[in-house]
């Protein structure tokens, strides 16, 4: 995964200008009034070629791939800092707000990489954030990489904060038995009436074993982790969520990123079900040499309905551009799902490409009144310029607000360069605060400042201009109906579909570290 800076800003309507600086952005939006705000920087890349020059080309002033989680008025985000060309970053950064995004405290996770406070590892990547209500502890899961013998993932670690996400302790080893772990994610059971209240679950795939799914469980606030368990399926990009009754549901892509499915545990992580296919994927390659794929973004409402969004071109004639589509669970175990529905950001004949969704669902809402927020990237027709947009729904996805442009006019060449293309992140994130606004976090960028450099490249490695920013929450306006969208698939699995989930021969062909 790459690093890029992030900024949080409230939504603007289409046509808004670029952010003042590249970065990671968080926004807060919902219907029906419009609000606009300016970007505020919440995190930086403190490194340079002199202080972090890994074995591969290293981008600086370049933070990428954010995740976030919220509890009450506290929002914690984590992201890569100093993205390295052939995998991972110099460090994992964090930004924490205790007042719904008004003020932020930022820093680097200690003792993870050799560039920060005595860490042992060469690189780190794939940060994911969770909160454990039983133990009142914040958790950030990270994948660490080593360079010797070729860059590869070697272990999953969990960093813990017991003071509301403001400072972080020495990371705890979660697992180091996989051949080459990738794409980790973390979640905790925060429902006091759940039989597994306080359980936390970390998911990843073992790229060195055909992208085999692995899960580990902690029952003590992330201090110790159990042995990995598996259902022997090939996956990538799983995002576990926990229902109020303690059932863990894990939406995921298959190892080849050609299908979206879900599996579950109803016994606190002791065993995991086979995968139910939600839908096959149709995907359009995004312009501009951008690193991007149809990985899922998943969340859950207050009653246990799971929502999963991904990039898909099935509704576009000739598959010439991508939409953001979604499906939601129709039963308590995630083994039945609604038809795939197009989110009506733009008309299906607009030619506008939409990709890398960051989905939020307000857990204080449920049923037909579930509130959904969606942050996403888009590129205008026949353009490689990147923009970031936001839309929301106050009725469980039946209708959606008019889209707002948060930032626009970013050249893909300003993004960090990696072996899999220019990168803003394999995923971005949105989280609802206690203000009932969806705070989205994403990477943004301006032109590098070194000499005549026009891209984040070998001539501008220390000046990629991608800091971490935030924005004051805003509110989206308007309403667009999705009721007449065509429906192509309503999957409930089946024996033929299970072939999609076979472990890939030899090493998995998809890895995103």
Q: What is the role of each PLM region?
A:
Residues 33-513:
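C-terminal PAP-associated
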Residues 4-35:
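Secretory targeting and sorting signals
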């Amino acid at each position: 995964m790459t690093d890029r800076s992030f900024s949080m800003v409230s939504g603007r309507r289409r046509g808004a200008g670029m952010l003042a600086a590249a970065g990671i952005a968080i926004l807060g939006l919902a219907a029906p009034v419009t609000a606009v705000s300016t970007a505020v920087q919440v995190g930086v890349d403190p490194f340079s070629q002199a202080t972090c020059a890994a074995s591969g080309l290293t981008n600086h002033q370049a933070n990428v791939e954010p995740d976030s989680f919220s509890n009450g008025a506290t929002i914690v985000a984590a992201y890569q800092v100093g993205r390295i060309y052939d995998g991972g970053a110099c460090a994992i950064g964090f930004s924490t707000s205790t007042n719904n995004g008004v003020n932020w405290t930022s820093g680097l996770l200690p003792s993870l990489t050799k560039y920060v406070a005595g860490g042992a590892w060469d690189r780190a990547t794939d940060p994911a954030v969770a909160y454990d209500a039983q133990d009142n502890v914040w958790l950030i899961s990270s994948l660490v990489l080593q360079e010797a013998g070729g860059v590869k993932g070697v272990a999953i670690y969990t960093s813990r904060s017991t003071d509301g996400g403001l400072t972080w302790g020495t990371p705890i080893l979660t697992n180091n038995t996989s051949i080459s772990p990738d794409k980790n994610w973390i979640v905790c059971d925060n429902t006091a009436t759940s039989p597994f209240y306080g359980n936390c679950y970390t998911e990843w795939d073992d790229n060195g074993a055909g992208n085999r799914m692995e899960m580990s469980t902690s029952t003590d606030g992330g201090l110790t982790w159990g042995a990995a368990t598996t259902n022997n399926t090939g996956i990538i990009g799983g995002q576990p969520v926990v229902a109020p009754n303690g059932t863990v549901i894990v939406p995921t892509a298959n190892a080849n990123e050609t299908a979206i499915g879900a599996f579950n545990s109803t016994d606190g992580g002791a065993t995991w079900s086979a995968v139910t296919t939600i839908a096959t994927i149709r995907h359009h390659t995004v312009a501009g040499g951008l690193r991007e794929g149809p990985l899922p973004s998943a969340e859950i409402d207050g009653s246990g309905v799971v929502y999963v969004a991904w990039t898909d071109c099935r509704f576009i004639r000739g598959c010439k551009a991508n939409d953001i589509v979604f499906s939601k669970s129709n039963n308590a175990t995630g083994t039945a799902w609604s038809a795939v529905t197009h989110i009506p950001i733009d008309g299906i004949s607009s030619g506008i490409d939409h990709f890398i969704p960051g989905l939020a669902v307000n857990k204080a809402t449920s049923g037909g009144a579930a509130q959904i927020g969606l942050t996403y990237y888009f590129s205008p027709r026949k353009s490689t310029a990147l923009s970031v947009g936001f839309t929301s729904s106050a009725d469980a996805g039946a209708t959606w607000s008019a889209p707002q442009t948060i930032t626009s006019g970013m050249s893909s060449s300003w993004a960090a360069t990696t072996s899999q293309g220019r990168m803003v992140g394999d995923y971005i994130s949105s989280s609802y605060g206690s203000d009932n606004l969806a705070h989205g976090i994403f990477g943004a960028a301006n032109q590098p400042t070194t000499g005549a450099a026009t891209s984040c490249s070998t001539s501008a490695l220390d000046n990629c201009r991608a800091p971490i920013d935030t924005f004051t929450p805003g509110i989206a306006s308007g309403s667009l109906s999705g009721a007449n969208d065509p429906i192509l698939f309503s999957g409930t699995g089946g024996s033929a579909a299970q072939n999609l989930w076979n472990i890939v021969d030899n090493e998995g062909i998809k890895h995103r570290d």
